[in-house]
Amino acid sequence: MNITLTKRQQEFLLLNGWLQLQCGHAERACILLDALLTLNPEHLAGRRCRLVALLNNNQGERAEKEAQWLISHDPLQAGNWLCLSRAQQLNGDLDKARHAYQHYLELKDHNESP
C-alpha cells in the first residue's frame, strides 16, 4: 500500500510538529516529523524542524545525520553547520564540533557582509 499526503496534510504535520517543539515536547515533535519525512523525505522544512527537535531531545547521533543530510543539500546555510556543531558536542566529538562551528562563523560572516 502506497500512502501519500496532500500538501495541506504535510503542512499540518509540520506545523503540529513545530507547535509541539515550541511547547517543550521535543519527543512528540519528532514523532510527527518522522511521519511527515517517512512519506516525503525531501521536505526541507520538515527536516530542519526535526533537526531542532532532535537536538532539544539530546539525540546527538540522529541529529548529526540529519544535519549532514541538510548540509549535503544546502551547504551554504549557516544554521545547518551550527546544528551540526551542537550535535557533535552532544556526541562528545569536540574537535569536529569546533570545525563545524568555525565553518558556521565563516558562512555567517560571509552572508552578513555587504
UniProtKB/Swiss-Prot annotation:
Keyword NAD: no
Name the UniProt record assigns to this protein: Chaperone protein YscY
Segments crossing the lipid bilayer: none
Localisation per UniProt entry: Cytoplasm
Keyword list, A-Z: Chaperone, Cytoplasm, Plasmid
InterPro entries xref list: T3SS_YscY, TPR-like_helical_dom_sf
Summary of the function given for this chain in its UniProt record: Required for Yop secretion. Functions probably as a chaperone which stabilizes YscX within the cell, before its secretion.
Coiled-coil spans in chain: none
Gene3D superfamilies found in the cross-reference section: Tetratricopeptide repeat domain
Subcellular location, principal: cytoplasm
Gene Ontology cellular component terms for the protein in this record: cytoplasm
Keyword Chaperone: yes
Induction per the UniProt record: Temperature seems to play the major role in regulation of transcription of the lcrE-containing operon of pYV, whereas Ca(2+) concentration has only a moderate effect at 37 degrees Celsius, and no effect at room temperature.
Oligomeric and partner information: Binds to YscX.
